[in-house]
Amino acid sequence: MKKYDVIIIGTGAANIVLDAALKQGLQCAVIEKGKFGGTCLTRGCIPTKVLATAADYIREIQDLPKIGVEVEPAKMNWDIISRRVWEKIDEHKEVLRHYQKYANLAIYQGSGFFTGEKTLQVKLHDGSLSEEMTAEKIIIDVGARTNLPEISGREATGYICSETLFGDKYPKQPYKSLIIVGGGPIGCEFSHIFAAAGTKVTVVQHNNRLLSKADEDISEQIRQNMEAFGIKTYLNANLLEAKKADDQKTLLFEDRETGERIEVTGEEIMYATGIKPVSKELKIENTSIEMDERGWIKTNEFLETSVNGIWAIGDINGQPAFRHKANYEADILAHNLFGGNEPGKWRWARYDVVPAVTFTYPQVAQVGLTETEAREKGYAVKIGKQFYHNTAKGYALGFTSGDGMDGFVKLIVDGATNNILGVHVIGAQASLLIQPFINMLNMGTVTLKPINEEIGSETAQELRKLGLTRTLDPHSVISVGETMTPHPSLAEVIMWTQYYFEGK
């Protein structure tokens, strides 16, 4: 049995924790079945935004005549754009080389799984099994994968998803036509990317609106914008069958409202149908780690699982699946476990100020409650709404009333206190406009609120009894680092400056 101080499964946000442990001189092991760097770097938010940025410029150039600038029609050079995508993805090699330099780190490349309460093995890439290992501290950060729908003909027809698109199924040129199943953030972003590249895009969405977790006003506006760009959207769709004939793929679905059966055809089908946990691969059943009914690992406000000495961060714990949220959790663990801080100075996670940004055209950003959520919680809701075109800068940018690209900001306010409950933005640079509200909602004094109260080490239980509070001073640079910043956005430049003061 090999013994380590720390074992980390996954090399996404958990690298923040790993760095802190290595800095302490602890004997560490890291297990990674794929490319180093996690989903975000290798097949998620970063390569997607490289593509989305090119698509943004296509749309912006098309809008330039509104402000008196005439240009030749723009088009994507897919080869150059793709080279930039893969240059970024290939940084995973540098991440691996960086960690190979540490004498106090063992790297296992393969699929890790539990053999007992705190024992692990790895099925290495060559097919062999590693020696069993254990550690005082184990951190799970294994992400999630696409939740493929159960539909007749899916495998025989073939498909792509975010995992395979940035893998062996990356297209040499944009598809002539593409069916995207799913109208959440991933589906909407890829519809923007490929439509701007000249692809005929059809979106088939099970829900009755796009971006179903966004405010309803935002959902409707993004649907109208997508339709204006020639993206056909179908809502309330129950999938029935996928099939292939020659070089075309067909998707059959039923409209739940009308009962009508509809067929759509395209060169490729992409499933962007949410995510599911990978807990089965970890063989969690060999431990006492509690999961919810879907298989997400349950954690408390200190990221502890139901097994002492095992923590879980990132997508696998079932909280909002964003890299900035995972980074936030990793920072908390690094602070609590390896920052030399007594329990009384521990940080804890809160999930009421988790921002979300969707890089469609225009962008969508939100933090806090939607109008519907606020009313359901019993608040005396007041709404403030303002359009870009009503500002001088909005006019300068060419936005006009009734223009589908004209953005707006919507504030959800508690009428009894005038406290902001939620902020929703659709429009140019929404990812930047949302940041001041994230900061505002995160500042002040917050009392520890238990999450999954049945989970808790002795230390966690004692801290709960103390009724700990933590104050984030809006004047302190430390508060910048403890506030989530949407990833990837330019607002991260501001957030990263605080590392200078922490010596990172």
Each language-model region and where it sits:
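Beta1/beta-strand and adjacent pyrophosphate-binding region of the FAD-binding site
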Residues: 1-12, 174-184
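Glycine-rich flavin
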Residues: 2-4, 19-26, 31-175, 207-211, ...
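Flexible, glycine-rich terminal cap/loop adjacent to redox cofactors
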Residues: 7-14, 19-34, 46, 50-57, ...
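Short hydrophobic core segments
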Residues: 7-9, 112, 120, 132-143, ...
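Glycine-rich dinucleotide-binding loop and its adjacent helix/turn
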Residues: 45, 142-200, 204, 232-233, ...
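A Rossmann-like FAD-binding core segment of flavoenzymes
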Residues: 72, 106-109, 113-126, 197-301, ...
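FAD-site-proximal beta/loop scaffold in flavoenzymes
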Residues: 157-174, 263-343, 436-443, 449-453, ...
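A conserved FAD-binding loop/helix module that cradles the flavin
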Residues: 214-217, 221, 313-373, 432, ...
